[in-house]
Amino acid sequence: MDTFDAIYQRRSVKHFDPDHRLTAEEERKLHEAAIQAPTSFNIQLWRFLIIRDPQLRQTIREKYGNQAQMTDASLLILVAADVNAWDKDPARYWRNAPREVANYLVGAIASFYGGKPQLQRDEAQRSIGMAMQNLMLAAKAMGYDSCPMIGFDLQKVAELVKLPADYAIGPMVAIGKRTEDAPGKRRSNSPGRIPLGKLLCLTKVWCLAI
């Protein structure tokens, strides 16, 4: 599928076939696509929890979100990020670079992130978002649909899955075969989309009022 087709056809689907399963190769392809997303200094701080256990998925649905896709989608992925990945053996992120380049960048990582917890958290969420978009567009290109979800108790779910304390929790992503059509998007100003002209600022200083 053409990249632009995947972008415009991707919708947040709520209803999935609970009996459909992805093959191991399809899952691998999705995960490989997700980790091609860019990260600052190539830190690759995203982490993906594949929630397979039916009872765990049912518990999450019943107690912390009540969204059908939590149990019905073929895949339920909790996307998180290691906030301290910048300080965990950073040389590995540049192991294939020339030594001079690697030494410089490893030092720059420490200088850029050290002692800046807010920046570290912000970077975690930025990285989560870019990986999620890769994941959802890859799913669309493979003929599947997806739904990003934030409508759940983040703290309770983090505790339930024993997420490490130094990880930032992000949205969940449901992926699978849809059973109902979602409203379409057009390449023009589709219903609900703010017109492009109100989102672009073409002057030297900020000019947007909305």
Swiss-Prot record:
CDD domains named in the record: MhqN-like (cd02137)
InterPro entries found in the cross-reference section: Nitroreductase, Nitroreductase-like
GO biological process per UniProt: response to herbicide
Gene Ontology molecular function, alphabetical: oxidoreductase activity
Pfam families the record matches: Nitroreductase
Keywords from the UniProt entry: Flavoprotein, FMN, Herbicide resistance, NAD, NADP, Oxidoreductase
Keyword Lipid biosynthesis: no
Cofactor(s) the protein needs: FMN
Domain of life, per lineage: Bacteria
Family according to the record: Belongs to the nitroreductase family.
Role noted for this protein: Controls resistance to the herbicide Dinoseb and metronidazole. Involved in detoxification of Dinoseb via the reduction of the nitro group(s) and this process is accompanied by the formation of toxic superoxide anions.
Protein name (record): Protein DrgA
Name of the gene encoding the protein in the UniProt record: drgA
